[in-house]
Amino acid sequence: MSTQPIKVLIVDDSALIRSLLTDIINSQTDMEVVGVAPDPLVAREKIKALNPDVLTLDVEMPRMDGLVFLEKLMRLRPMPVLMVSSLTEKSSFLTLRALELGAVDFVTKPKIDISRGMQEYAREITDKLRVAAKARVRQPPHVHLSVERKNTADAVLPMEHRTFSSTEKIIVIGASTGGTEALKSFLVAMPADSPGILITQHMPEAFTRTFAQRLNSLCRISVKEAEHGERILPGHAYVAPGNRHLLLARSGANYVVELSDGPPVSRHRPSVDVLFRSAANRAGRNAVGIIMTGMGDDGAAGMLEMREAGAYTFAQDEKSCVVFGMPKEAIARGGVDEVAPLGEMPRRLFGWLESQGNRAFRV
């Protein structure tokens, strides 16, 4: 019995992008473009008429903003959406907002030589469309989350950090598709005195700083884009810069950030496998590994290495994942100690830390 191809509707105000995406998608045997629309108002009618499986949506468009349309779509007719974004600071902020509103993932448009650049992205585009077609679509919460800069006692008196012994705990996290929202949910629950956290989220370099700044505005801990050589402090999370590997390193008794321009691993740079291996090598049983929603198997091998080195490891459960790919692979390879729903993970994490003799944390 033949499988029906994935039906894709392209929504983009650029005729060139619509044409290029159509050629890329129609070159695949398992998907087809059933329609195109130059703006959301036309798209609204074509969704009703064509009933597509997946939508590609430009962020910035005339007549109706892409985000306004996405918010209405997710409220009235939730469906998988793949955002198509430019590599600019403004677009990165808007794209992250789109992920908050329920988009499954995004791809970026090249800045120059669009025709050749889009062809180079062809595999990424088609892979992400396949994943989006199977992804769990989540309606965003109706309550708007206001973003206010947090104030702490640091505004009056800076915190003094002691020198840590080699038993200092460290948390390393890997995520991909659906990970921006999973990470936000997890990090918002982190207490201000949590162990240091290193994060590899598959994301282009124009987006990671904006992503870290967004998280920092929401969390009790401090969140920033990682810088080579900086000391890793409790109550801080460090996000891998796009196109650079993030590794855990040591300087005496302290953990520090190491960034590498080494080749892609598991097709990714930054790679979760690279981060997890560095944690296995340099922290061993003092590390906790967490693998979250994402397609593919990046992190599965590294998580097994962490567990074999004595680290404790968590995987996000299938029900709470947008895409149960990376966690599924890590579980299958025997690298996972505990599988947990995303909402339960902070409590279970700190319950385990306290069972190992660490002080109590207020989660």
From Swiss-Prot:
Keywords: Chemotaxis, Cytoplasm, Hydrolase, Phosphoprotein. The keyword Cytoplasm applies. Its EC number is 3.1.1.61, 3.5.1.44. Residues 7-124 form the Response regulatory domain. Its main location: cytoplasm. Transmembrane segments: none annotated. One of its GO terms (cellular component) is cytoplasm. It catalyses: [protein]-L-glutamate 5-O-methyl ester + H2O = L-glutamyl-[protein] + methanol + H(+); L-glutaminyl-[protein] + H2O = L-glutamyl-[protein] + NH4(+). Phosphorylated by CheA. Phosphorylation of the N-terminal regulatory domain activates the methylesterase activity. InterPro entries: CheB-like, CheB_C, CheY-like_superfamily, Sig_transdc_resp-reg_Me-estase, Sig_transdc_resp-reg_receiver. Residues 164-356 form the CheB-type methylesterase domain. The modification 4-aspartylphosphate is found at residue 58. Belongs to the CheB family. Involved in chemotaxis. Part of a chemotaxis signal transduction system that modulates chemotaxis in response to various stimuli. Catalyzes the demethylation of specific methylglutamate residues introduced into the chemoreceptors (methyl-accepting chemotaxis proteins or MCP) by CheR. Also mediates the irreversible deamidation of specific glutamine residues to glutamic acid. This is Protein-glutamate methylesterase/protein-glutamine glutaminase 1. The gene is cheB1.
